[in-house]
Amino acid sequence: MERRAEAPPPPQGLDFTVENVEKALHQLYYDPNIENKNLAQKWLMQAQVSPQAWHFSWLLLNMDKVPEIQYSAPAPCTSRSPATGTTSLPDQYESLKSQLFTHITRFAGGSKIVLTRLCVALASLALSMMPEAWPCAVADMVRMFQAEDSNVDGRARCLALLELLTVLPEEFQTSRLPQYRKGQVRSVLAQECGSVFPLLEQLLQQQDSPGFIKQKVLKCFSSWVQLEIPLMDCENLIQAAFTSLQDPELFDTAVEAVVNAISQPDAQRYVNTLLKLIPPVLGLQEQLRQAVQSGDMETSHGICRIAVALGENHSRALLDQVEHWQSFLALVNMIMFCTGIPGHYPVNETTSSLTLTFWYTLQDDILSFEPDKQAVYQQVYRPVYFQLVDVLLHKAQFPSDEEYGFWSSDEKEQFRIYRVDISDTLMYVYEMLGAELLSSLYDKLGRLLTNTEQPSTWQHTEALLYGFQSIAETIDVNYSDVVPGLIGLIPRISISNVQLADTVMFTIGALSEWLADHPVMINNVLPLVLQALGNPELSISSVSTLKKICRECKYDLPPYAANIVAVSQEVLMKQIHKTSQCMWLMQALGFLLSALQVEEILKNLHSLITPYIQQLEKLADETPNPSNKLAIIHILGLLSNLFTTLDISHHDDDHESTEVKKLPVQQGPNPVVVVLQQVFQLIQKVLSKWLNDAQVVESVCAIFEKSVKTLLDDFAPMVPQLCEMLGQMYSTIPQASAIDLTRQLVHIFAHEPAHFPPIKALFLLVTSVTLTLFQQGPRDHPDIVDSFMQLLAQALKRKPDLFLCSNLDVKALFHCGVLSLKFPEAPTVKASCGFFTELLPRCGEIAPVGQVVHENGKVLLQAVLEGVGGQASRSLMDHFAEILFALNKHCFSYLSIWIKEAMQQDGFPSARVSPEQKETFSQQILRERVNKRRVKEMVKEFTLLCRGLHGTEYTADY
């Protein structure tokens, strides 16, 4: 069709005529100018709710109009009905209903999208009229379309009726009817199924019904069952859907219908009907086997969905039918077949993953019975779960190396996730099978490794180890009598493959807590781990395992420390591992060194970090460029990760079992502090060249921040130097990481008299520099503002005396906080709210704070109400509520005046709230000085009113 020339935007005052609506629609669809499109859309929305909408809608549906115009025509019918939240005039219902029936009949053989749109409009109207104005809506629809009409083909009318009946429940599910009306309408619709289901049954059973009609019937049934219709009323159609599974054209739609029908939560009430469904499900087994043999993944997938839907949703109800235990066990075995379906997931099959949650559900239901009944079910189902373990471990096996080499990276990732799901299932199954499961795995592994006549594949060995690892990672195996044997077997494994080696490493890591209780066995596995460190393909598994061993067994590692450090140094120097693994390795070494004597720690630290210090000295002399920047960040990262875990005071110890092994607290300076003091000047030199680079500054701050967190009071000797350096850094180029480190220092040391002077000086300097930044315009630095607000809150919490300093401009800080409340970044606003909730309670005890709040509190209230009125994200309302609560609690006499004055402004905080609503909110806030939760509820309620969202479905869960 030829496009018309670009039309100008329709003026806002233009009459709502057919011609003007057509022009606006043409502009909306074809105008390349986005502003014109937006204007057209805005005008069309006004047209939809205008009185003339009823008139032009029908004219736009003329057959000579293009589909885009016809498609938009029914819009006023849906936008004006109560089902979507507004109202229509009762005297227009009959006319509207009649017109919609007429046009649906006309379009029955025409454009599918226009027909669907008209059906949605009639469905929306029906929902708004039920039950009072149109009590038998569905029966009337069926009757109207079954009436003879010589102008319209019978099949076309049938399809139109089925489309209407399909969209009606769908429209109900998405409607914004009030909750009480929704219940009413659902009940009416459920009763109306008596007019629908016989028709659907008749169409499915007719021999001459074409496939496309039957498919539409199944879709319609699938839509209706989601209205919580009693399962026994669906019985005939479910059986018909089972029959349709034999027709390849209807298979997918029939699966959807059966699954939707038996998955309804209410279905478990109809146990007799559920029992009747087991035979037809079991009857699908031959079709399932044929599909598996022929590689028909779609059919096997669909049949599995049906079996799992019945088993998973109703296992408790079916288990309760003791006299039918054999039929349910047959269903369980059918699902077991689906779990163990031949082929490798996801390349040869995608079905087995559907079944995993069923095994969780069945186990939960069995274990929820009282002990006597549970014992009976355990007797039946324990063998099933042992079989499940074998099936899962078989499914977890890697394919041959050759086959795996052809897999795409996406397929490998899906297989990895699938194995994680299997691992989670095995961990869960342990609750049912207990120690016997570990014994079974150990026996199988032992036979596998000692059978010289029949050498096993590495895949089989790896899968059994993977089963062990899955359980040992989350279950306390310290009292298992098979773990010593397993530790003894591990060195006998012939590792010829990366996947197997990875699993060996992860299994050792999973047993690290057991090794801590049985240190004599460490030497059995540690050499394997150290050897694996040198293999880049085993990077993640070997490094994470060494880290676990060093963390859990550190008090038993001194005899091996020299070897561990030497091997680690070697792989670090060779740059075998990626950055993140290098960081983990340094953390491992930190744990290891923590258990040594101070002299030993210093000696090892010297040999470990000297090469990096030398490299850093060299880099500090070079002209800054991207490559040496990465090297600097890497070295600083290594140091900060080492210092994160190197803790001779044992702050990180929380295991009772290690209490007896703890070394006495060391006297003298902490080794980390010794090293930091030695490299301090070098770090300052690096900073001098890289001060304008946020990443380098962040890396420097990270060294000290992690050290402070780990060492706590032991860091004290460094405080004066660090405060001075931070002051120089922040004065030159303000950065958030420097404020964050300042906050840490305030948190740990500000309350100690000896350290108060340098921290006070640093706090005042950071405050002064940041205030200057605010004067210049802080909008480009939300991260700095965020960190600064957190620093102020921390200072008020830990050392409020800082706000008594004569050269601290409390008024300026207050106004910075108010300005920060208006930032678009939610974390910044949250931090600002945190500042005020700490500041306001100090009004009475800190005179400068009290004076500033009393003189400027109205500005704060104004900003808070603006946020509540719609300027801030709804997710922040709890934080604004806390400020209002604090104002009311600590400045009540002022707040009562401020809130009255603020609310008297027209349109404030929103034009959507009336003076009465504002007055109610004000009084509610002023009355509540005890219950903070109640204030939060008030604020949430008021913000919805301000945004025009109150009472809508959109905010039902808010």
Curated annotation (Swiss-Prot):
What the entry lists under Pfam families is as follows: Importin_rep (PF18773), Importin_rep_2 (PF18786), Importin_rep_3 (PF18806), TPR_TNPO3_IPO13_2nd (PF24138), TPR_TNPO3_IPO13_3rd (PF24140), TPR_TNPO3_IPO13_4th (PF24139), Xpo1 (PF08389)
Q: Name one GO biological process term.
A: protein import into nucleus
Q: Where in the cell is it found?
A: Cytoplasm; Nucleus
What InterPro entries does this protein's entry cite? ARM-like, ARM-type_fold, Exportin-1/Importin-b-like, Importin_beta-like_NTR, Importin_rep_1, Importin_rep_2, Importin_rep_3
Question: Any signal peptide, and if so, which residues?
Answer: none
Cellular component terms (Gene Ontology): cytoplasm; nucleus
Q: Keywords on this record? A: Cytoplasm, Nucleus, Protein transport, Repeat, Transport
The HEAT repeat units are at 19-49, 51-83, 90-130, 137-174, 189-226, 231-263, 271-320, 325-367, 370-433, 435-471, 482-517, 519-553, 557-595, 598-643, 671-711, 715-749, 756-798, 810-840, 855-888, 892-926
Q: Which residues form the Importin N-terminal domain?
A: 40-106
- Family membership: Belongs to the importin beta family.
Q: State its role.
A: Functions in nuclear protein import as nuclear transport receptor. Serves as receptor for nuclear localization signals (NLS) in cargo substrates. Is thought to mediate docking of the importin/substrate complex to the nuclear pore complex (NPC) through binding to nucleoporin and the complex is subsequently translocated through the pore by an energy requiring, Ran-dependent mechanism. At the nucleoplasmic side of the NPC, Ran binds to the importin, the importin/substrate complex dissociates and importin is re-exported from the nucleus to the cytoplasm where GTP hydrolysis releases Ran.
Protein name, entry field: Importin-13
Q: What is the lineage of its organism?
A: Eukaryota, Metazoa, Chordata, Craniata, Vertebrata
Q: Which gene encodes it?
A: IPO13
